[in-house]
UniProtKB/Swiss-Prot annotation:
Part of a membrane-bound complex that couples electron transfer with translocation of ions across the membrane. This is Ion-translocating oxidoreductase complex subunit E. GO terms for cellular component: plasma membrane. It comes from Yersinia pseudotuberculosis serotype IB (strain PB1/+). The complex is composed of six subunits: RnfA, RnfB, RnfC, RnfD, RnfE and RnfG. The keyword Transmembrane applies. It is an enzyme of class 7 (translocase). It is found in: Cell inner membrane. Keywords: Cell inner membrane, Cell membrane, Electron transport, Membrane, Translocase, Transmembrane, Transmembrane helix, Transport.
């Protein structure tokens, strides 16, 4: 398997930042009340990861190891500030909905962790791909959790998509469950913890089934007895 495929597999599934490393739980649980909010924060985090990894990798030869962490934080803060201004300019409704969690990307362990563990030691192209894979893995987990909570809580999917994609995206709103009253548990923080636990359990079950399938497909080569070996010769 090539290095690029390994990075994609690690970021999207095997070493998923949300479902394996359990990093960034604060925004994961707080913002995932709707699919739109989850998708918006996930894409913003992905953009920050790609830009940060690219910058750290490009500058890695000129950054003294003694002060590398403050420099990484400055790079991350600069990228996050740029992304925050872009969201404020082009998706103001989403900017208001996400609130403080956009600037809090600076303190997200995923970003500083990938900058230190991978980008500082590898070429620019692979570092950018690593940031993309890790960001998309977190985005997928955020989106699935947000979609589940929105469906169970409000009976809808992609409510408020126009905040992220523009006025045309109002057609994406789907009424799945017709609820007389919203299911508040799904929309509150306890529902987020329960939903995350279900996602973790689901990933574990899938991983175990994949391991069992690989074990069943192994070809057992029979050992030749001495007499059989002589006949073969």
């Amino acid at each position: 398997m090539s290095e690029a495929k390994k990075l994609l597999a690690q970021g999207l599934w095997k070493n998923n930042s949300a479902l394996v490393q359990l990093l960034g739980l604060c925004p994961l649980l707080a913002v995932s009340s709707t699919a739109t909010n989850a998708l918006g924060l996930g894409l913003a985090t992905t953009l920050v990861l790609v830009c940060t990894n690219t910058a750290v990798s490009a500058l890695r030869r000129w950054v003294p190891s003694e002060i590398r962490i403050p420099i990484y934080v400055m790079i991350i803060a600069s990228v996050v500030s740029t992304v925050q201004m872009l969201i404020n300019a082009y998706a103001f409704g989403l900017y208001q909905s996400l609130g403080i969690f956009i600037p809090l990307i600076v303190t997200n362990c995923i970003v500083i962790g990938r900058a230190e563990a991978y980008a500082a030691k590898n070429p620019v192209g692979l570092s950018a791909l690593d940031g993309f894979a890790m960001g998309m893995g977190a985005t997928c987990a955020l989106f699935v959790l947000g979609a589940l909570r929105e469906i169970l809580g409000n009976g809808t999917l992609f409510d408020g998509a126009d905040m992220l994609l523009g006025s045309w995206a109002t057609v994406l709103r789907i009424d799945i469950l017709h609820l007389d009253t919203p299911f508040l548990l799904a929309m509150l923080p306890p529902g987020a913890f329960i939903g995350l636990g279900l996602l973790l359990a689901g990933k574990y079950v899938i991983d175990e089934k994949m391991k069992a399938r690989k074990a069943n497909t192994r070809v057992n080569v029979p050992q030749l007895q001495d007499g059989d070996a002589e006949k073969a010769l």
